């Protein structure tokens, strides 16, 4: 079972085809965008796994990878995704635009399209896809857009969704918006779900959403993992 599979091993490093989920994401960005610096944030339990991955990766690909151990070991003590982002920004004094993503999602299209979209719009951006199942809508972030892809509403796990566009954990943040994380946390922004900051930010400043041109596979359990492996082995 994937719980057992990932109890002592991080999901982003599970193999899909000939390489890990994280390799698929990182290699795509290096090959198709001008992104050349990566930061992996991990809990203490898995930090060494990512350090080992980094050592092997840097033997074959010449780009900068930093692994940050957030020092937490349990669900009860974890910082939450938004505070993890804040930790990285403060620790590394980051003052650039950021692409933030969860490492356990596989895409069948290039993220370069999303990066180009964000540059063109010159706002912080999210990705979205149609989700027509109510139960799934209630477990994710749901947005509505106008005809220029501007976000008009953004709700985390809504009981009564206003639309059917779901937001997966991929975000392009402008540097000026990244500076507002502390302000967000002080003003009611949730810190656990990765999309909480984007939801808060969308009410403060214009944000756009890129409608995904392909599929995203979330590795949630053993069935979804086996399915993704079968898709990528074709």
Regions found by a protein language model. Name each.
Residues 49, 83-87, 113, 196-197, ...:
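Alpha-helical elements of Rossmann-like donor-binding domains used by nucleotide-donor carbohydrate transfer enzymes
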Residues 7-12:
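Short alpha-helical oligomerization interface
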Residues 144-150:
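Short acidic-glycine loop/turn motifs at beta-strand connectors
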Residues 115-119, 150-218, 222-234:
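Catalytic-core segments of class I nucleotidyltransferases/pyrophosphorylases
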Residues 109-138:
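Conserved donor-nucleotide/metal-binding helix-loop-beta segment in metal-dependent transferases, i.e.
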Residues 1, 15, 19-100:
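Conserved N-terminal catalytic core of the sugar/cofactor nucleotidyltransferase
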Residues 105-108, 216:
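A short, conserved beta-strand element in the Rossmann-like catalytic core
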């Amino acid at each position: 079972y994937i719980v057992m599979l990932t109890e002592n091993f991080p999901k982003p490093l599970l193999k899909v085809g000939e390489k890990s989920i994280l390799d698929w994401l990182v290699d795509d960005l290096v090959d198709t965008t001008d992104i050349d610096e990566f930061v992996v944030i991990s809990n203490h339990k898995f930090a060494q796994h990512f350090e080992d991955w980094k050592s092997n990766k840097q033997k074959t690909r010449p780009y900068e990878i930093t692994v940050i151990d957030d020092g937490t070991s349990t669900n009860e003590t974890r910082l939450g995704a938004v505070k993890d982002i804040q930790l990285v920004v403060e620790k590394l004094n980051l003052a650039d635009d950021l692409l933030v993503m969860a490492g356990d999602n596989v895409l069948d299209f290039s993220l370069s399209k999303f990066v180009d979209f964000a540059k063109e719009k010159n706002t912080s951006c999210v990705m979205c896809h149609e989700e027509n199942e109510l139960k799934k809508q209630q477990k994710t972030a749901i947005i509505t857009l106008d005809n220029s892809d501007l976000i008009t509403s953004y709700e985390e796990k809504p009981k009564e969704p206003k639309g059917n566009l779901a937001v997966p954990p991929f975000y392009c943040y402008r540097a000026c918006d990244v500076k507002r994380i502390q302000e967000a946390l002080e003003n009611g922004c949730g810190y656990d779900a990765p999309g909480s900051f984007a939801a808060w930010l969308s009410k403060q400043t214009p944000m756009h959403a890129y409608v995904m041109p392909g599929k995203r596979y979330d590795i949630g359990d053993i069935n979804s993992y086996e399915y993704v492996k079968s898709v990528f082995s074709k």
